[in-house]
Amino acid sequence: MHGTIYVKTMGIKYTTISKTGRRSNNEDCFNVLKMPEHNRFMGIVCDGMGGHSFGEVASEAVCNAISKYWQDNTDTPDSDQKVVMACKKACNAINQKSYDLSHAEMGTTMVMVSIEGDKATIAHVGDSRCYLLRQSEGLLYQTEDHVRIDFGWEIVSRCFFSYRPEVAVPDIRQFTIQKGDRILLCSDGLYKSMAPDILQARMLDDKPLEDILDVFDFLCQKQGDDNYTAILIEIE
């Protein structure tokens, strides 16, 4: 999926990728909302937690719930409170899915960006990431993974998890964006398949967005072992 929309005086180009990789099924889910008539654009990536059953159910439930809340509230300015309310809706959605499946445990991460004019609101729960890069300055912002190390294992410390709303606490940041800025939303299957300097250098390449994701796709196929999903955005 790719395209270009216009928000106020800015154009927003984007392209996406989501692949199973070496796993048996794809537990990632993503969505893009294009709302130029409301001066808005929104992208979201969710990564179902493979250590639990129904990861793909969890990621789809949260992705759909937050997308629906955002679309139903286009007249409400972006804010921390708006993100928190969307996350509450997502918690309700994952709880309902768990109930429907005999109280099955399920969980997912989430990362999103909402662009309103020249303002970008970035929120995440878990270890899916957002990168914001500017041609003249390089990396402006990278989300901080919600993980801890237990006995040498990485454990996701915040996520959307059935009947555990207290761990679905988002980090939220707002930025003023400029023409030329690039934003990447991705699951850990993508960024763990390449060195950080390679990822950032490729994001700033003077190439079409589709060509950049083609490089990421190649590296994930060659070096990755997980599902991988990304939304790459450029402000024109």
What are these language model-derived features?
Residues M1-E236:
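PP2C/PPM-type serine/threonine phosphatase catalytic domain
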